[in-house]
């Protein structure tokens, strides 16, 4: 955001500006005549800047007089008008400390350097030469440099006295690690921040190399004490930074310094919610950077839970309530950091999402608040309009905070009550009056507070933040807590709409007394007791409460020991409502969520849930997720792939249930999902094998890249994938099977590609905590189960031309490349076209297709109706197998396959697509099947598949009663006969 332009100095501030100018001139004149000449050579713009800044900031006015030589030097070096390059602050301080002789001198030089930089930073901030980001960055870089260089200097001096601390386990020299917390950690320091620090060291041991040794704990405690003194002590030169150590374990009562093991143990066993919040922004600001990153890695699981963690909202809400109580107690409503709509509320909003989702969405594991807000927008957690308001309000508040602190270099966020200071703050912010400034400030605070309440507020509070008179589900509390006898409980359930009230009561009682609930800790039990009444209240709003309760309670039992999921649903009534709707519509969805509760996350965002992404977006999203995971972390890669598949599968099912996705699009999305996963699985498997064995070679000796394709047959090849469909795959390579790979542990090409195929199958079928990706069927490869797992392109072509049965050519109609090398894909498509289009004896072809179809009906069709051919097949008491009986799905597929094999030689356009609907369109365009018959076949095919999809969502077989689809079946049988297929 941008502030209003700086106006002319208000009349009230003109005397202060004149006094400051006169005092500066006198101070410079007292130096020498040359100094005065240098001042008089200042351009008018700089003199005007000085008058403005000095009138607005007592600190600048006083320091300019106290050390006018410093101000002249800053001006002549261009530091007032130009930004510092990265690393420049550190370089300047390093040069100033080079010949530092003792600790007193260290303190003096640090303080003078801080004063110099503080003056420069305030000058640039108040003259608008520096944007907010630069000001915060420079202040944080100043703190980093002072902390790290002072720590380095003191460590060196202490080693001379007591020897070098050595790790007992590693035998390596040890250095202290300084973690910067809060605004320092996030590179967001304000003009007069204190700095929150935590000290650690890698491991216990003792010093070596001096007459008197210390154990490492004592060595680093002394070092920490000296560092605090060097930075925090107030002397005639002022201070460097106020140091706050209260964020360390046990606060002020705990040791000053901790070993890494002690820190990890503390946070694992005793870490509190507010400490997770504080640790989000932790950054290594001094000491051993490499060891510090190791420490942060050890603590990351404490901060970011791998499951959805809505308990974070409870913690943030509690913290906010405590802050509000303190604000009210101390009359701090005018505090722009802690008051309503203040800076802290924006931070809480961002950190709520980080703590809830950051364990799974690694893009949220970052420190700067504005970057987090951008990620929340980019990843769809918050709408752009909300992020724009939060960003604008936050920046306005931070500018105002700097304006207040610039007055006297004092740590405060309270709006001034003094009229003179109010005029100064309004002037700095670019407003003509305090009233105009305060009106804009109030606007931003109101917007921030409104958004804060949407994210953090208790769902049982009203808009004022007070507890609502009757929280949702309060009428069900006595029943759940068994304050009612069984008869009264059943009556309440029946009155609320349950058909079988006794069964509903038994289910609730079984849950309450079941082993999962009995084993819950107190906090989890409290969460369950808060959730179940809310669940019952929303269940009775559904037209099928018995069914909903039956399907949802297994989920409640499944997550009982991970009660954060109960908090998620309690905190998000919309998500709970969507859960009940989906469970009522589909037992498959209910069981999937109960088995993988992490899917509850998908229910939070209604827009995302019912709008699955397009193919390119799917692939890009998966690629981005995997790129955030270290290449050697196979376990996390496998889990990410599985969660991605589960999440998007749920989104497709939800869209199907809601009616926002038609059948053809459902299959498209599920097919695209499989394709995106196969592309990444191939990449993972290829990378692993190449790292171990090197790359396989082509016949000309050049390396393969990867010269391998995954071919999809059946439903995935025909873009007709369904929920729970298997992958029918064939692997083909075009490398040299005899040539050895070019790596250290070389193997021949045939071995390499076989192992590549095995690894792909393993990645797809391996059982992990998030289940498997897909079941894989490789029986359509050349020679079936007896054939090689991976065929060379040449071998595949020879097999198709010389050995393949007609039914294998039928299968080839639906075959297409899903992932792999474009060159080999083009070669495969050429082989496919050549094989399918070759001339055939049509009588022999009809016989072979008919015989194969008859064999399938005999084995897979409904026996009681002779696979739909008997006279009773159309009776209501009969069963019709949508796929295998006469007039069903397979009949249509066989007709399409017959047509391609019979006529694609003369009509090559029939080979363009692999899905039945578009091949039928091609047959119509070629005049091979009448338009009316094509419409009949297409509509019947879509109707059958839609019914099969609906049954799959109900976990039922693809069978309906014989009275269904009678017209469609008869027409399909008629067309089958007209094609003389038996």
Swiss-Prot record:
GO MF, one annotated term: [glutamate-ammonia-ligase] adenylyltransferase activity
InterPro entries found in the cross-reference section: GlnE (IPR023057), GlnE_rpt_dom (IPR005190), NT_sf (IPR043519), PII_UdlTrfase/GS_AdlTrfase (IPR013546)
Catalysed transformations (reactions): [glutamine synthetase]-O(4)-(5'-adenylyl)-L-tyrosine + phosphate = [glutamine synthetase]-L-tyrosine + ADP; [glutamine synthetase]-L-tyrosine + ATP = [glutamine synthetase]-O(4)-(5'-adenylyl)-L-tyrosine + diphosphate
Cofactor: Mg(2+)
Enzyme Commission identifier(s): 2.7.7.89, 2.7.7.42
Keywords for this protein: ATP-binding, Magnesium, Multifunctional enzyme, Nucleotide-binding, Nucleotidyltransferase, Transferase
GO CC aspect terms: cytosol
SUPFAM superfamilies: Nucleotidyltransferase, Nucleotidyltransferase substrate binding subunit/domain
Region (Adenylyl removase): 1-460
UniProt xrefs under HAMAP family: GlnE
Matching NCBIfam families: PRK11072.1 (NF008292)
Protein's UniProt name: Bifunctional glutamine synthetase adenylyltransferase/adenylyl-removing enzyme
């Amino acid at each position: 955001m941008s502030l209003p332009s700086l106006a002319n100095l208000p009349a009230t501030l003109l005397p202060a500006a004149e006094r400051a100018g006169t005092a500066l001139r006198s101070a410079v004149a007292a130096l020498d005549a040359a100094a005065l000449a240098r001042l008089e050579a200042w351009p008018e713009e700089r003199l005007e800047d000085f008058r403005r800044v000095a009138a607005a900031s007592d600190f600048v006015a006083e320091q300019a007089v106290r050390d006018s030589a410093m101000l002249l030097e800053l001006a002549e070096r261009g530091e007032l008008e130009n930004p510092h390059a990265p690393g420049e602050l550190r370089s300047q301080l390093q040069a100033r400390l080079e010949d530092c002789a003792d600790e007193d001198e260290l303190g003096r030089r640090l303080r003078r350097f801080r004063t110099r930089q503080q003056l420069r930073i305030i000058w640039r901030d108040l003259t608008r030469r520096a944007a907010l980001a630069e000001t915060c960055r420079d202040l944080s870089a100043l703190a980093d440099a002072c902390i790290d260089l002072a720590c380095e200097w003191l460590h060196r001096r202490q080693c001379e006295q007591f020897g070098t601390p050595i790790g007992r386990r590693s035998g390596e020299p040890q250095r202290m690690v300084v973690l910067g917390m809060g605004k320092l950690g996030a590179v967001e320091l304000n003009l007069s921040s204190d700095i929150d620090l935590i000290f650690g060291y890698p491991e216990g041991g003792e010093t070596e190399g001096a007459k008197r040794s210390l154990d490492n704990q004592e060595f680093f405690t002394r070092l920490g004490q000296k560092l605090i003194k060097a930075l925090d002590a107030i002397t005639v030169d002022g201070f460097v930074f106020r140091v706050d150590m209260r964020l360390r374990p046990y606060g002020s009562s705990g040791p000053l310094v901790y070993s890494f093991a002690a820190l990890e143990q503390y946070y694992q066993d005793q870490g509190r919610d507010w400490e997770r919040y504080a640790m989000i922004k932790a950054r290594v600001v001094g000491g051993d950077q490499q060891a510090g990153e190791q420490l942060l890695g050890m603590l990351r699981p404490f901060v970011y839970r791998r499951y959805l963690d809505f308990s974070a909202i409870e913690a943030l809400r509690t913290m906010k309530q405590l802050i509000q109580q303190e604000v009210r107690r101390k009359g701090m409503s005018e505090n722009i950091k802690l008051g309503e709509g203040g800076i802290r509320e924006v931070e809480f909003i961002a950190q709520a999402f980080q703590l809830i989702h950051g364990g799974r969405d690694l893009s949220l594991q970052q420190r700067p608040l504005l970057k987090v807000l951008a990620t929340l927008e980019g990843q769809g957690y918050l709408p752009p309009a909300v992020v724009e308001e939060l960003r604008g309000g936050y920046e306005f508040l931070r500018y105002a905070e700097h304006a207040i602190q610039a007055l006297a270099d004092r740590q405060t966020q309270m709006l001034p009550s003094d009229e003179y200071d109010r005029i100064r703050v309004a002037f700095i912010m670019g407003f003509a009056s305090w009233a105009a400034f305060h009106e804009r400030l109030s606007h931003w605070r109101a917007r921030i507070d409104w958004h804060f309440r949407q994210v953090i507020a208790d769902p049982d509070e009203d808009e004022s933040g007070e507890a609502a008179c009757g929280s949702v589900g309060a009428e069900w509390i006595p029943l759940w807590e068994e304050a009612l006898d069984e008869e009264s409980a059943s009556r309440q359930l029946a009155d609320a709409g349950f058909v079988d009230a006794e069964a509903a009561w038994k289910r609730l009682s079984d849950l309450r007394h079941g082993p999962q609930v009995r084993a819950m800790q107190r906090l989890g039990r409290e969460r369950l007791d808060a959730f179940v009444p809310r669940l019952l209240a929303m269940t009775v709003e559904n037209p099928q409460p018995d069914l909903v309760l039956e399907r949802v309670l297994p989920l409640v039992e499944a997550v009982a020991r991970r009660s954060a999921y109960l908090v998620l649903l309690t905190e998000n009534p919309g998500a709970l409502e969507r859960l009940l709707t989906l469970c009522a519509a589909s037992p498959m969805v209910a069981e999937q969520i109960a088995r993988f509760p992490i899917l509850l996350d998908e229910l939070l965002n209604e827009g995302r849930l019912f709008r699955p992404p397009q193919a390119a977006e799917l692939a890009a999203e998966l690629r981005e997720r995997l790129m955030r995971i270290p290449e050697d972390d196979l376990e996390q890669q496998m889990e990410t792939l599985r969660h991605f598949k589960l999440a998007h599968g749920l989104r497709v099912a939800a869209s199907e249930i809601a009616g926002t996705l038609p059948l053809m699009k459902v299959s498209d999305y599920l097919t695209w999902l499989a394709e995106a996963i196969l592309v990444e699985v191939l990449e993972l498997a290829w990378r692993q094998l190449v790292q171990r064995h090197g790359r396989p070679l082509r016949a000309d000796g050049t390396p393969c890249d990867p010269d391998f394709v995954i071919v999809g047959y059946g439903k995935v090849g025909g873009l007709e994938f369904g929920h729970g469909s298997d992958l029918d795959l064939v692997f083909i390579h075009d490398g040299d099977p005899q040539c050895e790979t070019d790596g250290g542990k070389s193997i021949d090409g045939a071995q390499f590609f076989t192992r590549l195929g095995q690894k792909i199958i393993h990645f797809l079928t391996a059982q992990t905590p998030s289940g498997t990706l897909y079941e894989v069927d490789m029986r359509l490869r050349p020679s079936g189960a007896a054939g090689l797992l991976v065929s060379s392109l040449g071998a595949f072509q020879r097999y198709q031309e010389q050995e393949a049965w007609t039914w294998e050519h039928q299968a080839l109609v639906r075959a297409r490349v899903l992932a792999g090398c474009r060159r080999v894909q083009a070669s495969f498509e050429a082989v496919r076209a050549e094989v399918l289009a070759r001339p055939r004896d049509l009588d022999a072809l009809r016989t072979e297709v008919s015989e194969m179809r008859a064999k399938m009906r005999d084995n897979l069709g409904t026996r009681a109706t002779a696979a739909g051919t008997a006279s009773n097949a159309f009776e209501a008491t009969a069963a019709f197998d949508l796929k295998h009986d006469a007039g069903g799905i397979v009949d249509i597929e066989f007709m399409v396959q017959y047509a391609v094999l019979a006529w694609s030689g003369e009509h090559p356009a029939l080979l363009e697509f692999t899905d039945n609907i578009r091949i039928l369109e091609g047959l119509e365009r070629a005049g091979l099947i009448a338009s009316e018959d094509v419409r009949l076949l297409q509509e019947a095919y879509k109707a059958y598949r839609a019914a099969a999809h609906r049954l799959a969502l109900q976990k039922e077989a693809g069978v309906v009663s014989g009275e269904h689809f009678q017209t469609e079946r008869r027409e399909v049988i008629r067309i089958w006969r007209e094609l003389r297929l038996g």
